[in-house]
């Protein structure tokens, strides 16, 4: 079946808000056998939305609209779809009471315009929004499926997973089974990856390299008329890539580097402290984004200046004078001293030049110290100041992951 996603809102067209809804929905629809061939972004203009929706009716089987279900005058999605399908909007009393209860629970007064959100196209099903006021809507008309979802990503995902996805699985006629996964790589470029994977050919399978900043993700796709065959093909493809790229693979699908590091520390019963110069606390910030990190991450110090390195972490003056403040030796001193300061099993130290001035912009040194020895990573990263710092964080976390897996 052919799918289409229509995203509604001036804020999307004008670039104020990143449209993550379309990405999420495309991934989800692919998994259940709906091939998304079209995406449109339409502003808060009634005639434009009617025209866009009419076009989608002529070419797509499943049409999902996001946004424009709010209480204000520029929220026009229901009105535009109802005009195209020649449906009246009727007050749904149950939905009206749910919206009133939502405000009562928050101890807030419901505005009169929120009543607008309880109007539903005649014959449509309500997709209950458990975390917001805008309900989703599900319409079957002849051979078309039309769904409307709230715009806020958290609400959209909740309504899709709880309400819309089960209906789609029940109602659609899949033209086969699609399976996909993602393999995540660090330390190898897209062109190098392409050289390695170009000889891997499995019928009805596809590998799509996606170059990200300092990483490459491989999107794997498998198709078959039989679900088990689709899964087996995908597994075979994953195994082949694991064999060829094992030294660069750090994760799969929804894995996050910081979560892998924290969970591995937990599994091994180890503790960590970090001393950062160039990255200014970004590594510590990433680690503390993970729930339960306090069990293994004891703390960090940003020793940005030479004085801070000397006074906060008692780095040797001789080391700084002989090797400079950006060097393997200074990073080792930071790692060693932070480990002692926080009495942890592992210490990590990082120094570098984030730029934009200087001859060695992008150079960084990360040293990891533990009871089993030390590990050193040095790279020169491209990009501006922010990109370099983010890249150093990713590379350092990956080096820590490798240190823990040794």
Curated annotation (Swiss-Prot):
SMART domains: MoCF_biosynth (SM00852). Signal peptide: none annotated. HAMAP family: CinA_B. Pfam families: CinA, CinA_KH, MoCF_biosynth. PANTHER family: NICOTINAMIDE-NUCLEOTIDE AMIDOHYDROLASE PNCC, NMN AMIDOHYDROLASE-LIKE PROTEIN YFAY. It comes from Natranaerobius thermophilus (strain ATCC BAA-1301 / DSM 18059 / JW/NM-WN-LF). SUPFAM superfamilies: CinA-like, Molybdenum cofactor biosynthesis proteins. InterPro entries: CinA (IPR050101), CinA-like_C (IPR036653), CinA_C (IPR008136), CinA_KH (IPR041424), Competence-induced_CinA (IPR008135), MoaB/Mog-like_dom_sf (IPR036425), MoaB/Mog_dom (IPR001453). Transmembrane segments: none annotated. Disulfide bonds: none annotated. Belongs to the CinA family. This is Putative competence-damage inducible protein. The lineage of its organism: Bacteria, Bacillati, Bacillota, Clostridia, Natranaerobiales.
């Amino acid at each position: 079946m052919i799918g289409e996603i229509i995203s509604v809102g001036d804020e999307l067209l004008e670039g104020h808000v990143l449209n993550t809804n379309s990405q999420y929905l495309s991934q989800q629809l692919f998994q259940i056998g709906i091939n998304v061939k079209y995406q449109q972004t339409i502003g808060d203009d009634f005639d434009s939305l009617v025209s866009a929706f009419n076009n989608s009716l002529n070419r797509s089987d499943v049409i999902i609209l996001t946004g424009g279900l709010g209480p204000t005058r520029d929220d026009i999605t229901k009105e535009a779809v109802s005009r195209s399908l020649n449906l009246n909007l009727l007050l749904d009393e149950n939905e009206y009471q749910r919206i009133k209860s939502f405000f009562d629970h928050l101890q807030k007064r419901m505005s009169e315009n929120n009543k607008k959100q309880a109007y539903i196209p005649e014959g449509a099903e309500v997709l209950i929004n458990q975390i917001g006021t805008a309900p989703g809507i599900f319409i079957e008309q002849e051979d078309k499926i039309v769904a409307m979802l709230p715009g806020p990503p958290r609400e959209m995902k909740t309504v899709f997973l709880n309400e819309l996805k089960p209906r789609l699985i029940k109602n659609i006629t899949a033209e086969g089974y699609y399976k996909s996964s993602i393999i995540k790589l660090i330390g190898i470029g897209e062109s190098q990856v392409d050289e390695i994977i170009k000889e891997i050919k499995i019928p009805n399978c596809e590998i799509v390299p996606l170059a990200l900043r300092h990483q490459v993700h491989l999107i794997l796709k498998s198709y078959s008329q039989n679900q088990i065959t689709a899964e087996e093909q995908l597994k075979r493809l994953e195994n082949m890539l694991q064999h060829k790229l094992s030294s660069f693979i750090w994760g799969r699908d929804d894995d996050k580097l910081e979560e892998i590091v924290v969970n591995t520390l937990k599994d091994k019963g180890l503790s960590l402290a970090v001393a950062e110069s160039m990255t200014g606390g970004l590594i510590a910030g990433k680690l503390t984004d993970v729930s339960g990190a306090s069990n293994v991450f004891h703390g960090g110090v940003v020793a940005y200046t030479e004085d801070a390195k000397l006074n906060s972490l008692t780095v040797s003056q001789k080391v700084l004078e002989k090797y400079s403040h950006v060097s393997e030796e200074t990073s080792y001193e930071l790692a060693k001293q932070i480990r002692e300061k926080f009495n942890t099993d592992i210490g990590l130290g990082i120094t570098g030049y984030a730029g934009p001035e200087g001859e060695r912009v992008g150079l960084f040194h990360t040293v990891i110290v533990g009871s089993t020895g030390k590990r050193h990573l040095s790279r020169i990263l491209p990009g501006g100041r922010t990109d370099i710092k983010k890249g150093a964080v990713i590379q350092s976390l990956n080096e820590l992951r490798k240190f823990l897996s040794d």
